[in-house]
Amino acid sequence: MAAAVGVRGRYELPPCSGPGWLLSLSALLSVAARGAFATTHWVVTEDGKIQQQVDSPMNLKHPHDLVILMRQEATVNYLKELEKQLVAQKIHIEENEDRDTGLEQRHNKEDPDCIKAKVPLGDLDLYDGTYITLESKDISPEDYIDTESPVPPDPEQPDCTKILELPYSIHAFQHLRGVQERVNLSAPLLPKEDPIFTYLSKRLGRSIDDIGHLIHEGLQKNTSSWVLYNMASFYWRIKNEPYQVVECAMRALHFSSRHNKDIALVNLANVLHRAHFSADAAVVVHAALDDSDFFTSYYTLGNIYAMLGEYNHSVLCYDHALQARPGFEQAIKRKHAVLCQQKLEQKLEAQHRSLQRTLNELKEYQKQHDHYLRQQEILEKHKLIQEEQILRNIIHETQMAKEAQLGNHQICRLVNQQHSLHCQWDQPVRYHRGDIFENVDYVQFGEDSSTSSMMSVNFDVQSNQSDINDSVKSSPVAHSILWIWGRDSDAYRDKQHILWPKRADCTESYPRVPVGGELPTYFLPPENKGLRIHELSSDDYSTEEEAQTPDCSITDFRKSHTLSYLVKELEVRMDLKAKMPDDHARKILLSRINNYTIPEEEIGSFLFHAINKPNAPIWLILNEAGLYWRAVGNSTFAIACLQRALNLAPLQYQDVPLVNLANLLIHYGLHLDATKLLLQALAINSSEPLTFLSLGNAYLALKNISGALEAFRQALKLTTKCPECENSLKLIRCMQFYPFLYNITSSVCSGTVVEESNGSDEMENSDETKMSEEILALVDEFQQAWPLEGFGGALEMKGRRLDLQGIRVLKKGPQDGVARSSCYGDCRSEDDEATEWITFQVKRVKKPKGDHKKTPGKKVETGQIENGHRYQANLEITGPKVASPGPQGKKRDYQRLGWPSPDECLKLRWVELTAIVSTWLAVSSKNIDITEHIDFATPIQQPAMEPLCNGNLPTSMHTLDHLHGVSNRASLHYTGESQLTEVLQNLGKDQYPQQSLEQIGTRIAKVLEKNQTSWVLSSMAALYWRVKGQGKKAIDCLRQALHYAPHQMKDVPLISLANILHNAKLWNDAVIVATMAVEIAPHFAVNHFTLGNVYVAMEEFEKALVWYESTLKLQPEFVPAKNRIQTIQCHLMLKKGRRSP
């Protein structure tokens, strides 16, 4: 338990009354009114350590407001109780949740009726054919047809509709829907074991076609014989023609007597039942029961009711059938199967009710949780933002370190109006000029009167006292940057709103990250290199001449092969043809001649004569001409001038035209081309702030916020004079200090910065606290603010620990630009010589008691240039930065390759490389709408079907039968890819609801049956069989798709085939197929990723890295590729003991 001390955030005071209560309240008011910058919430840990709580709800924006403080406490207590309720509610839900996923399997194994039935009801044929024989009515078929009559070679069929035109008959059940729609009745195939096949032929000893002809002749002679019409019904049932069966049965019903109607009724009921008009069939069989009590009618009705789900009626009918024929095995088995299914459905309904109840409880829990989050927002509204808390704590830690390390960790007090320093022991005491000890005259050690006068070391006698006092009164933060572009921080004393802008200033000046057209352009002057152009005067040319413009084409042009490739494409770019004057360039141009009133035509004449009569290196004049044409807005002439300046400039000065040409491209929106030029300029000279600022602007326009911030940071580090840079300083500082104002977050794991879109729901909440890079930059600046002081401490933030350490240096001389040091007491020289201050350290250490998991990668904005990693943010300042030794032998430094270090590898969560990752290239990537090929709207009324492709498709040049896996597909060891189930079920999800696997398979089968040449449908069928785990059937469909697909579409079935071969461990075949897919469509990231997966399975890790990296080039935010790259790199270093790939 942690007890609150100091300004108590929890108010864990014992109950008291009277004066004690008043005293506590007055003490609280007195402390709350101070408004100090230190932490306002401290706790005592279990080991007795007093520890500050950085991320505490009691650290308020307005710590002096007692009412808010008390409300905050009430909200904290309420949230604690609400959290307990939520936890209890969640436990209750989890304890009562029905998680019985094996209910059906266990029921089928344990239920007595299921055991007797042996098979589930769904596996029984409930369309089992039945009929009543003519012999049961004492009628012999031979009496109605001439069995001895010869049959012609082309026998006739007994078409009852041609024999007799039947009028409306009350006996023919024409009111039933199935009878009315008899023309459209479906005809599922009859099983070969159906007894109807052998009834007539076995009885009459003739073939069914001969019998049909004899029935036709009999009906020609006697058109009113109900016996012949029933025989015709039997004939058409054998032929599986439901329409003809109904027509003949209707005529049999019309002419037969009441006691003989059951024969035709059972025939009619069988046809209607098989055509899925089971309710109509039940009506017909009930009519048959009115005329007879035959076993067949009850058995047929039992099957019909079982199909309709009327299980009680079905069991009753089976019981009647067994009374008529005891021991009939089919009736016994079906009766128990129906009872088994009935009890299973009852159990499933009970489980559904339980799950529905759990769902309602979860909805209620979600409401409570939302309420909890709203209360949490109220709590956060008054809490100090995390960055400010960290900043205040760093200041506090630093101040505490100052007081504690004045002399061997002894604490000294300023007394006598800060003119004397009182210390406990006679030990060396060090202080720093220009700090709070400036006015100290003597130091007193212990309780005696021994004092020591001031002994100044390296003291600058001519230091301005008023300046020092001003610096004492100002915030120490203002001195955290010693030099900015050749000017010390005192030069910015009247520009604090730029150097240290407030959040409100940034919100007003830059409410969002500027887009490309809002960013300034720059001009890198040659004066930065110590080069100057001789100023033109009117003596050099006649002012009466006609105005001229600079023509760079008249200069000699020598081709520079080293840099020509960077600008060779610019001459033909259509987007550079438009005239777009650059106001920034115009202001720069006018400022360079120090005359804002001179017309542009006169400037053009200046440059025209300068080019014709150069009085300086010609490339310098061409560089100025490029600026002129930028201001005018003629990109063609500007490129011509700058290209010639680039080719004529000495190598060490080529960054000047490169930077200026890049700014021209930035003005025209060609930011990616501009980054290439700027990176080349940095390779020539990395000491120009304008180059980094230009690169930062290009990265901003490309939404590469990480690269932009790092480029700006590099620009701030330079001490080169740059007056032109100061206009961009406020934007840079706003983005550094208030990243969350611009929706910029920084990833702890990857070191890259992401710009989030407002309202995006793709970013997931991380379990770990994400600390802004800019806070760490502030920490680094505090090291510069007090360069001769050391401190140590720790900040706790939501399971993160930020350790602060300072290491002492005293032997730096005045050339370092830091304050001189002075000493009181026994100051031994060897102590100073032996001690040294080195780099300030910031390390983040995970708390051992927290088990925080890494957040999966998000969409990350990565650099688009190969060496862009030079400008990736580094979150861990590990100092001192010592140059690593050079390469020894053939070993290379993997960190220079951008690989993670061994320590980082141990912290990373590795991907299981042996796991098979299934990929699928959707036909929508080819601009194909799947709903135009598959009907998702029409309800399915027929039994489930499966999409079958032609397994005997002849070999062609497209079917890849030369591959072992394709030619021997029947013997593949293929385990299936059930992870693609959701992909299959979500086909057409944008327009229609999700459907079951069986429904999707049936829909594909229906359209594929009509169109076997559609490569789209064949690919869908292959996806179905991949989910089902049937490798042979899947490859049959893929062969069919490859045979009929156009060349540019073949990568869709090829990717599926590569996955099947990968799953079957036929990796060489898989590589061939995936490579073909990449060659057809190299612009699809999934094709590259699939090929990388195959190489991983082959343990060809170097090749896999190449394809994963090309995947990221096509889709930079593809997280699985990033994770696999990191895992492979760590595997190569740690598992194989290698430091380089």
Curated annotation (Swiss-Prot):
InterPro entries attached to this UniProt entry: TPR-like_helical_dom_sf, TPR_rpt, TTC17
Tissue localization of expression: Expressed in germ cells as well as in somatic cells of the testis (at protein level).
Superkingdom of the organism of origin: Eukaryota
One Gene Ontology term from the biological process aspect of the record: cilium organization
TPR repeats: 295-328, 619-652, 689-722, 1014-1048, 1051-1084, 1085-1118
Keyword Repeat: yes
Gene Ontology terms: cellular component: actin cytoskeleton; cytoplasm; cytosol; plasma membrane
Keyword Ligase: no
Localization of this protein: Cytoplasm; Cell membrane; Cytoplasm, Cytoskeleton
SMART domains: TPR
Record keywords: Cell membrane, Cilium biogenesis/degradation, Coiled coil, Cytoplasm, Cytoskeleton, Membrane, Repeat, TPR repeat
Recorded coiled-coil stretches: 340-382
Function: Plays a role in primary ciliogenesis by modulating actin polymerization.
Similarity comment: Belongs to the TTC17 family.
PANTHER family recorded: TETRATRICOPEPTIDE REPEAT PROTEIN 17 (PTHR16091:SF1), TTC17 PROTEIN (PTHR16091)
Quaternary assembly: Interacts with CATIP.
Annotated protein name in UniProt: Tetratricopeptide repeat protein 17
Name of the coding gene: TTC17
